[in-house]
Amino acid sequence: MQKKYYKNHVIQKKWGQIFLKDQNIIHSIISILNLKKYQNVIEIGPGLGALTKPISDIIDFLILIERDPNLVNRLLHTFTSKKVKIFNKDAMTIDFSKLLTNPNQKIRLIGNLPYNISTKLIIHLYKYINIIHDMHFMLQKEVAQRIVAQPNNKAYGRLSIFAQYYCKVQALLEVPKKSFIPIPKVESMIVQFIPYHTNNPYPTVNISLLSLLTKFAFHQRRKIIHNSLSSLLNSTEIIQCGINTESRAENLTIQQFCKLTTILHHKYNLN
């Protein structure tokens, strides 16, 4: 198979590498971020530094996480200042609490995430939600649409529920395929995640139970909720949550899923 290059770098298809090259998009992203010089900023997957350079020009200290050792070597030669620290690691293995350089400033996360790990990585990052100020990620458009989807939408599902349970999410910018090298098969979007540190609109629930409940509910999403949850809850319990038993999973709000989870929790006397 013929190797593909970008700026003399061998593009690693196994890691889903694509490189942002559109300067207009880069300027738009920097504007959206509205960075302050004192903030704790971590960039995941900096690639060859298309965003890194303008970010490092603004802030006092920047952490980069890059798994490709060849890219790390390039970055080390490009960003020689002590204000940029580079980790040659897989972001999925990182304890982000150890990267909190200023305990008075929560982390801001930025990244052009490989499409093949974006969902898993976001779920991993939610473990550190209490120390995160916000996150801005470039995602495959389909994944972005699933994250921000509302009830009564075919894109609405388990990912929508978990993303929105922890964060206010918003799609901010659509990025065309031609903005990248190599040109991907799909469009991309910038999605903003702002954690609910206070005033969470959803009640605190057992997350493992919410995961189980939504797994049953969306396993066969065309089933009515009475049938899909029959092994967990009866009709009376579903109606108690103000839910029509003829509804389908995609019709239920996150608030309603939380109510069902609470009933399930009490039903089995779980602590």
UniProtKB/Swiss-Prot annotation:
The keyword RNA-binding applies. It catalyses: adenosine(1518)/adenosine(1519) in 16S rRNA + 4 S-adenosyl-L-methionine = N(6)-dimethyladenosine(1518)/N(6)-dimethyladenosine(1519) in 16S rRNA + 4 S-adenosyl-L-homocysteine + 4 H(+). Specifically dimethylates two adjacent adenosines (A1518 and A1519) in the loop of a conserved hairpin near the 3'-end of 16S rRNA in the 30S particle. May play a critical role in biogenesis of 30S subunits. One of its GO terms (cellular component) is cytosol. Its EC number is 2.1.1.182. HAMAP family: 16SrRNA_methyltr_A (MF_00607). This is Ribosomal RNA small subunit methyltransferase A. SUPFAM superfamilies: S-adenosyl-L-methionine-dependent methyltransferases (SSF53335). Keywords: Cytoplasm, Methyltransferase, RNA-binding, rRNA processing, S-adenosyl-L-methionine, Transferase. Belongs to the class I-like SAM-binding methyltransferase superfamily. rRNA adenine N(6)-methyltransferase family. RsmA subfamily. It comes from Blochmanniella floridana. One of its GO terms (molecular function) is RNA binding. S-adenosyl-L-methionine binds at residues 20, 45, 66, 90, 112.
